[in-house]
Curated annotation (Swiss-Prot):
Binding positions for ATP per the UniProt entry: 38-45
Keywords: ATP-binding, Cytoplasm, DNA damage, DNA excision, DNA repair, Excision nuclease, Helicase, Hydrolase, Nucleotide-binding, SOS response
One GO CC term on file: excinuclease repair complex
Name by which UniProt lists this protein: UvrABC system protein B
Organism in which the protein naturally occurs: Cyanothece sp. (strain PCC 7425 / ATCC 29141)
Phylogenetic placement of the source organism: Bacteria, Bacillati, Cyanobacteriota, Cyanophyceae, Gomontiellales
Length: 665
């Protein structure tokens, strides 16, 4: 019996019991890698939850974006209501990295907006890893970035125990040392206040308040209290207060780091001057000396992460400490949608280094800034003790490394079989598809259509609209949250047909979609490769009448393999249903906007409308300016995501001017 306890209204069915048993046996035999090859809608998350329960190891579930991470976290919290299921993603609402564009001689400072709630969830994850074994952390790829040294984070924490005498002044100094600030008026996360014999602390990792009551110098009581009503929620005998930031540097380490930074600066200046890069040398000298002064005086400076190698005492090239280092030695990794996530792990390091190289070469940063980086792929896998890859279409690397430990999960608990596939010629494909669409609309079903080009998607959308079809076009400029809104509207029946160039979004749960149409299916490329075709066809695999139509004049190798694999699965599923007398049942799952509630949604004007509104800002009433600022911030975030730094800087400057106007400057 492990510490994990599943609460589920249903037992494993279909292929799930076999998959659970085989995965569990493989892990217990101490095999390092195994793959769950699970068709869409077969309940892979349920299977993984059962395996976690049986194995009982702290588990990291890695998803390739924060939206899917939130979905997985919600599902696992439902399965494990009495265990710690944590959520760990990047805490930036907006992040524009420091950058330099040599062509235009443009330097762009790092600007960021931290989401306090997500920061709290990150701290909650590391606290749980220190205090419990029954922990599941669902994370995005941000977990491979530096997070501070676990041992220093733990050693810096402040223990409290009822009945123990403490020096109250020293206790307050200790809280300040671990980045808590005193605020007797506004108590929040990362703050504390003192009223007589009562000390109240807002921990960085939860929204409850810790109240410590003293009798003289002795701790008389420790309680969790409601931050609004002050009502006691729980009484405790002891408690540990963890730092308000993950990066904690002891004073003696800070002094050594400053000396090391100064030594590196001296060597780098000599190097730049020898290359006759006098401007770069002057720039680096001025910036670094200012940072050193800030570090010595207040222990912090803007861009402090660029000195992380010195602050952590690492050797050049040594990998940073990450979330993985907060796990115990014996832990389990689950890589969701591994065919997307594994390549993402490989790609993070190279993209980070190319930007930093420019900053270093032009005197904005010391060479050691390159060691403030994500893990390299090989460094990441060296830290992994055991792993399950999960995908309907695992990549070749995952299949090779799993050897013969590839466990299939083909049968759906609902009895629904894989879609029936039809291949039709491209001649007259639009009118043929229109007829199919109208049939589905009459049955109140939904349709996904994928094209190869943006132009064709736009033309097809316009053609269908002219013929009375309620259709939407999903394009690349739509952000992740608005994308979820559109998909929810499709499920609710606000419109019936969704058209896009790349509707390949793994993990989409669209049980109302009964038809997937793939235009130009015989044009080989990423969007028409075998795995992409299987994933796209799988969007109709949750409907009892699911079908896929591939419009093509030739049968490509990718098409043949995708059709063969789908028909193989369909045959297995049909035979299972016949043997067990199962009638496929439709999935009844109400549309949920839980993710939208978690991640703030803001309606956005397009860029041209925003430019016009900004130009007319002098004529706007003051009460309308905050809304314009909100819209500009949204565009700034989008530009930064696309690495359009100059565009993002333009929006940043406009926001500053509007805020000055609000303040009457």
């Amino acid at each position: 019996m492990t510490g994990f306890q599943i609460k589920a209204p249903f037992e494993p069915t279909g292929d799930q019991p076999r998959a659970i048993a085989q995965l569990t046996a493989s892990l217990q035999a101490e095999h390092r890698f195994q793959t769950l090859l699970g068709a869409t809608g077969t309940g892979k998350t349920h299977t993984i939850a059962r395996v976690i329960e049986k194995i009982g190891k702290p588990t990291l579930v890695l998803a390739h974006n924060k939206t899917l991470a939130a979905q997985l976290c919600n599902e696992l919290r439902e399965f494990f209501p009495n265990n710690a299921v944590e959520y760990f993603i990047s805490y930036y609402d907006y992040y524009q990295p420091e950058a330099y564009i040599p062509v235009t001689d443009t330097y762009i400072e790092k600007t960021a907006a931290i989401n306090e709630e997500i920061d709290m969830l990150r701290h909650s994850a590391t606290r749980s890893l220190f205090e419990r074994k029954d922990v599941i952390v669902v994370a995005s790829i941000s977990c491979i970035y530096g997070l501070g040294i676990p041992s220093e984070y733990l050693n810096a924490s402040v223990p409290l125990q009822v009945g123990i005498e403490v020096d109250q002044r020293q206790l307050l100094r200790d809280l300040t040392t671990i980045q808590y600030s005193r605020n007797d008026l506004d108590l929040g996360r990362g703050r504390f206040r003192v009223k007589g014999d009562v000390l109240e602390i807002g921990p960085a990792y939860e929204d409850r308040i810790v109240r410590v009551e003293f009798f003289g110098d002795e701790i008389d009581a420790i309680r969790y209290v409601d931050p609004v009503t002050g009502t006691t929620l729980q009484s405790l005998d002891n408690l540990r207060i963890y730092p308000a930031r993950h990066f904690v540097t002891p004073q003696e380490r800070l002094e050594i780091a400053c000396a090391d930074i100064a030594a590196e600066l001296k060597d780098r200046l000599t190097e730049l001057e020898a290359q006759n890069k006098l401007l770069e040398a002057q720039r680096l000298d001025q910036r670094t000396r200012y940072d050193l002064e800030m570090l010595r005086e207040v222990g912090y400076c803007n861009g402090v992460e660029n000195y992380s190698r010195h602050l952590a005492g690492r050797s050049p090239g040594e990998p940073p400490e990450t979330l993985i280092d907060y796990f115990p030695k014996d832990w389990l990794l689950v890589v969701d949608e591994s065919h997307v996530t594994v390549p993402q792990i490989r790609g993070m390091y190279n993209g980070d280094q190319s930007r930093k190289r420019v900053l270093i070469d032009h005197g904005f940063r010391l060479p050691s800034a390159a060691d403030n980086r994500p893990l390299k792929s090989e460094e990441f896998w060296q830290k992994v003790t055991q792993c399950i890859f999960v995908s309907a279409t695992p990549g070749d690397w995952e299949l090779d490394i799993s050897e013969d430990r590839i466990i299939e999960q083909i049968i759906r608990p609902t009895g629904v079989v894989d879609p029936e596939i039809f291949v039709r010629p491209t001649t007259g494909q639009v009118d043929d598809l229109l007829g199919e669409v109208r049939d589905r609309i009459e049955r109140r079903e939904r349709v996904l259509i994928t094209t190869l080009t943006k132009r064709m998607a736009e033309d097809l959308t316009e053609y269908f609209q002219d013929r009375g079809v309620r259709v939407r076009y999903l394009h690349s400029e739509i952000g992740a949250i608005e994308r979820i809104e559109i998909l929810e509207d499709l499920r609710k029946g606000t419109f019936d047909v969704l058209i896009g160039v790349n509707l390949l979004r793994e993990g989409l749960d669209l049980p109302e979609v009964s038809l997937v149409a793939i235009l130009d299916a015989d044009k080989e490329g990423f969007l028409r490769a075998e795995r992409s075709l299987i994933q796209t066809i799988g969007r109709a695999a949750r409907h009892v009448r699911g079908q896929a139509i591939l419009y093509a004049d030739n049968l490509t190798d990718s098409m043949a393999k995708a059709i063969s694999e789908t028909e193989r699965r369909r045959a297995i599923q049909t035979a299972y249903n016949q043997k067990h007398g199962i009638t496929p049942q439709p999935i009844v799952k109400k549309a949920s906007n839980a993710i939208l509630a978690f991640l703030e949604v803001s309606r956005r004007l397009n860029a041209q409308e925003l430019d016009t509104a900004y130009e007319q800002a002098d004529e706007l009433p003051l009460e309308d300016i905050p809304e314009l600022i909100t819209q500009l911030e949204a565009q700034m975030k989008e530009a930064a995501k696309k690495l359009e730094f100059e565009e993002a800087a333009k929006y940043r400057d406009r926001i500053k001017q509007l805020r000055d106007k609000l303040l009457g400057r």
